[in-house]
Swiss-Prot record:
It comes from Rhizobium leguminosarum bv. trifolii (strain WSM2304). Its EC number is 3.5.4.2. Keywords: Hydrolase, Metal-binding, Nucleotide metabolism, Zinc. Catalyzes the hydrolytic deamination of adenine to hypoxanthine. Plays an important role in the purine salvage pathway and in nitrogen catabolism. Binds 1 zinc ion per subunit. This is Adenine deaminase. Belongs to the metallo-dependent hydrolases superfamily. Adenosine and AMP deaminases family. Adenine deaminase type 2 subfamily. It catalyses: adenine + H2O + H(+) = hypoxanthine + NH4(+). It is an enzyme of class 3 (hydrolase). Its cofactor is Zn(2+).
Length: 322
């Protein structure tokens, strides 16, 4: 129903996009038992805590620069196959350090995967470096400094992810100042696990152009108006929200309400195979579960390009491909 539509994704965690088949092959390669996390070709978890545990276990089987090149290439090839023209991948150099690969080799592998995929299909991709709240402000500042000093043209944004309930956004404001001063685009996870107040905190402390999720803003009518007035773009991931119980079903999900209130919204998949979804399915849901027309979906894709962390020449080229 929506395969013919051009697609753009602004919110996807790279390790969270690992296809189960590739993960199974990687586990065999390293002799790692992931039978508790991967059964019948699907990732297994039952609540947010076990999702994070499953995510970490899956990430363990990606260890080398080539592993990350292959993971990135595989995901971008999948996107290109459904008419996707642009993708932003959320990546963590800190994760590269923790697994002993190192931040530079981690990023280098990912960039090689982007190069391979683009050579085949023309898909464009950029990287958003993320700090993780649960490792504390100093770790997040380190991630921002890495992104700011990398001098890598594919690193164009900075994000804050991880456990939303760990501290207030103001605790991490210094990291965003560093990223902003380096000319990086700013986005932040808020309004997912925590309520509308976390979105307000993000606006007050960080002044981001985009917010990852942000859907709990619907709980505060004044905040919704503020988002609309500011033109802040929400990276909405409906399948993820339902899978994690942020909302009980698509009928209660606020994507359409937010759009009709004038908030700029886009569609993404977050950690697709973990939530039994894909970018293709998210676009299908936009049509079938939310009743958006092709023109309305195209408008959200256009919003995503307008909000993408790219140079103006690339933005014009992407808009011309719609």
């Amino acid at each position: 129903m929506t395969l013919h539509l051009k697609k753009v994704e602004l919110h996807c965690h790279l390790e969270g996009a690992a296809p189960p088949e590739l993960t199974a092959a990687q586990a065999r390669k390293y002799g790692v038992d992931i039978s508790g996390e991967l059964r019948g070709g699907a990732y297994v978890w039952h609540d947010f805590a076990s999702f994070l545990e499953c995510y970490d276990k899956v990430s363990e089987v990606y260890r080398t620069e080539e592993d990350y090149a292959r993971l990135t290439e595989t995901y971008l090839d999948e996107l290109a196959g459904i008419n996707t023209i642009y993708s932003e991948l959320i990546v963590s150099p800190d994760h590269g350090k923790r697994i002993g690969l190192g931040a530079d080799a981690y990023i280098s592998g990912i960039c090689e995967g982007i190069r391979r995929a683009r050579e085949k299909s023309g898909i464009e991709a950029r990287l958003i470096v993320t700090g993780e709240r649960h490792f504390g402000p100093e770790s997040v500042i380190g991630a921002a400094e890495y992104a700011a000093k990398a001098g890598n043209p594919l690193i164009t944004g900075f994000n804050l992810a991880g456990e939303e309930r760990m501290g207030r956004v103001a605790d991490y404001a210094r990291a965003f100042d560093i990223a902003r001063d380096a000319g990086l685009g700013l986005t932040i996870h808020a309004g997912e696990v925590c309520g509308a107040f976390s979105v307000a905190d993000a606006l007050d402390a960080v002044h981001p152009s985009r917010i990852g999720h942000g859907v709990r803003a619907v709980e505060d009518v004044d905040l919704v108006k503020r988002l609309a007035d500011l033109g802040t773009v929400l990276e909405v991931c409906p399948g993820s929200n339902i899978a994690l119980g942020v909302f009980p079903d698509f009928a209660s999900h606020p994507l359409r309400r937010l759009k009709e209130a004038g908030v700029r919204v886009t569609i993404s998949s977050d950690d697709p195979p973990f939530f039994h979804t894909s970018l293709a399915r998210e676009y299908e849901l936009a049509a079938e579960a939310f009743g958006f027309s092709d023109a309305e979906i195209d408008a959200m894709t256009r919003t995503a390009i307008e909000a993408a962390f790219v140079d103006e020449e690339t933005r014009k080229a992407l808009l011309a491909r719609l």
